Amino acid sequence: MMRIALFLLTNLAVMVVFGLVLSLTGIQSSSMTGLLIMALLFGFGGSIVSLMMSKWMALKSVGGEVIEQPRNETERWLMNTVAQQAQQVGIAMPQVAIYHAPDINAFATGARRDASLVAVSTGLLQNMSRDEAEAVIAHEISHIANGDMVTMTLIQGVVNTFVIFISRVIAQIAAGFLGGNREDEGESSNGNPLIYFAVATVLELVFGILASIITMWFSRYREFHADAGSARLVGREKMIAALQRLKTSYEPQEASSMMAFCINGKAKSMSELFMTHPPLDKRIEALRSGEYLK
């Protein structure tokens, strides 16, 4: 119930800001060009801001601590491993962080290849062998080298724009049809504003769910390629061993918003269509077949 209330309030806030910006810029909301411009700004705006703040948000989300100077042998090994792999793929040394969590997990984020972050859980360092941990780190380094964070942002921006634009076009038509378009009597050309808001809200929710299928598909696709990148860096058997170890780990504790960035996604889902990660068995099979290594 709280999520629904927050969604409605957020949508109302977006609608209000949308209207204010349209008024200030003099763009007519009934203009398809104006609506598309605003949908692009709002659609990409949130994604780009999230990307620019991704390192800070990720660290705050998991309570991670960036290693400035290694304090023990484990931290020295971790820093050296990240530095070596970053050099292998030709990227600048990422920041390295550790966060406290019992599950075996790690993630990479950052707005640019040369300004990135790799974070690992204490559960990973305590429960994985060095070879397995090395493979997981290589998986995250591959995400950075492949530019997955930026590509994900672009895809999210496109689907956000689609959802905002199409929802409001249909809502505008519905409000005009059901509420009567009486612009000449002083009412908005959008028709009844309550109908417009209700239809736009419902459609944004429905289209948002459908759009998430696209972003989740890309998230799963990039996991296969990051696994393959790890196999190239440290060897196929090490990556397979790491994935097999993940099968025995705790249910990931990271927030849902972080799942797309982690190597170990949640195992349970209503449908594979909405999973950020492919099933571990499929990832292992893909490595064994060499499907993404070609």
UniProtKB/Swiss-Prot annotation:
InterPro entries: HtpX_protease (IPR050083), Pept_M48_protease_HtpX (IPR022919), Peptidase_M48 (IPR001915). The keyword Transmembrane helix applies. GO terms for molecular function: metalloendopeptidase activity; zinc ion binding. It is an enzyme of class 3 (hydrolase). Its EC number is 3.4.24.-. Disulfide bonds: none annotated. Pfam families: Peptidase_M48 (PF01435). The active site is at E140. It is a multi-pass membrane protein. It is found in: Cell inner membrane. Belongs to the peptidase M48B family. GO terms for cellular component: plasma membrane. The chain crosses the membrane at residues 4-24, 34-52, 158-178, 194-214. Zn(2+) binds at H139, H143, E223. The gene is htpX. GO terms for biological process: proteolysis. Binds 1 zinc ion per subunit. Keywords: Cell inner membrane, Cell membrane, Hydrolase, Membrane, Metal-binding, Metalloprotease, Protease, Stress response, Transmembrane, Transmembrane helix, Zinc. Gene3D superfamilies: Metalloproteases ('zincins'), catalytic domain. This is Protease HtpX. Its cofactor is Zn(2+). Its main location: membrane.
